[in-house]
Amino acid sequence: LAVLPNAPAMIHLSKGRKTLLDKRNRLLKQLLEKKTIDSSTYELAISEPLPDEPHALPQIAPYLVSRFYQERNGEYSRSTINKGIQTQVEDLAERWSNEFGRSDIRNLAILVIDIPSNQVVAYCGNVHFDRKQGGNQVDVIQAPRSTGSILKPFLYYAMLQEGSLLPDMLLPDVPVNINGFTPQNFSMQFEGAVPASEALARSLNIPAVTMLQRYGVPKFHSFLQQIGLKTINRSSSHYGLSLILGGAEATLWDVTNAYAMMGRSLLQLPQRSCSLLLPTSRITESTDPFQPGAVWQTFDALKEVNRPEEIDWKSIPSMQTIAWKTGTSYGFRDAWAVGVTPRYAVGVWVGNATGEGKPGLVGAQTAGPVLFDIFNLLPSSSWFTRPAGIFVEAEVCRKSGHLKGRFCDETDTLLVLPAGLRTEACPYHHLVTLSANESQRIYENCANTEPTLRKSWFTLPPVWEWYYKQHHPEYKPLPPFKAGCGEDTFQPMQFIYPPMNARIKLPKQLDGSKGFLTVELAHNNPNATVFWHLDETYQAQTQDFHKISLQPAAGKHSLTAVDGEGNTISTTFFVE
């Protein structure tokens, strides 16, 4: 100790040990020469080795420590963190960060909430706290980030709770243009119609936008604020329909808390923001935003989300049941994954804190594997118990997922929320009169001229049908009417693009000239011929694939299509 003050930064037990040993020995020699110590004491002292290097100070939960330092003003703080879980999560985050670093993905955040106690047990705000560049000093748990698809379960829940949706109700998955907003699925494919629960499990964008349009942006915006997403603080009109696809920003803290509250509703526990400090903060009065019945049905859909593993996880009894959801923001800037069991809610964010996008930054491919590695570290638990005394039985159409209609011939008796009994009965089953061999439809005025039969027929709108039958070979379009049997009031055509009153900007060609507009329709007769007219001027005819390119001038236009049977359909659009 006597020699350390001379150069404490250059010579200490962890640095310059040889120099330190020499200085100590010189001091002992001087003490001997001055007879401060005797020779035996000198020999004993000089033979002693230097003390071992001190262990590095622990760096557990550095981002949480930094947060407390900034927010607590030096006040004594005792956190809820479980040291064992925290260190395992930090080690896992370090390993995954090294893996992601090969793709120049530099940041990763993890939050683990114990649902029964409502306490945070692991808080990993980022990785590589010691690095001063690359955004590693940012506590991403508290940073607002684009939500991608991570909010879709909240919309699904809200519509179930309201009674405007049943879990397997068919939703459109076709090209849409809503005031210039043209959402696309991640796969860039369309399936015509998809059950709502499957659309959620597969995170299809077009059904989600259709749901939000039906539910209402202002109402959903208000609900998101009610469940604690504090950074969604602009007006609902600012976000519009993009709110469901990542048009808003939320923090990992708020999102994971909201999922944890869903879990707490099934455990019949109060729904409040989780705690970071012991003792737990004073309980405040609050209204529980989630009701267990609709949460149960939402988690039923989220259990079916495909896991990152290549194995058939559903066939392995020991695999823990987890309700989980991923999200990927526009431009591949943010990858999310949040999962819930009766014991834990885990939130993961992967990306670059600087906002830099990377092609492989997809929730299911990056944040998802991290999420399941964390659940593998945590104690497993059995699944939630279905809420009692909430659901009622209802007959539901097997094909459409709607309540049974007059002509539905295949139904299932399912448990639904009482509010679900207010939903629309199946609109897709119709009673039709057919020829004896079912090859033609017959009008009543012809029914007495030949043998006929009446049959229930599942029929989707033409555009839905066009895509649906490509994925469902069992789907049978309605047969055509028998010629000469009266006028067909059924409309066999529907425009895919443009929709009515669409406002369109034509692209420019490489040479600067005006580009083309591609128009398309669906016809339920695959052999039909369609004749196209723009502003009453004939343009072209099509067979099989009804799609043509036009080059209209700026202004208002009328597009008309006529098929070989005389059926006509028109739409109006504006070229800016």
Predicted regions located by residue number:
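Non-catalytic, structured segments within soluble enzyme domains
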Residues: L1-D91, C124, P183-F186, S222-Q225, ...
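Substrate-binding clefts and substrate-entry loops adjacent to catalytic sites
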Residues: L4-S14, Y69-Y76, G180, E198, ...
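Extracytoplasmic/secreted proteins, especially bacterial periplasmic and envelope-associated proteins
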Residues: K15, T19-Q30, Q59, Y63, ...
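Active-site SXXK
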Residues: L31, V89, N118, Q137-L171, ...
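Conserved catalytic neighborhood of penicillin-recognizing serine enzymes
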Residues: P54-Y69, L165-F220, R264, P279-E304
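A short, well-structured edge-of-sheet supersecondary motif
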Residues: V65, T80, S103-Q133, S222-I227
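A penicillin-recognizing enzyme superfamily signal
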Residues: S79-F100, V112-D114, Y123, R131-V140, ...
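Soluble, non-transmembrane domains of envelope/secretory-pathway proteins that act on or interact
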Residues: N179, I322-E576
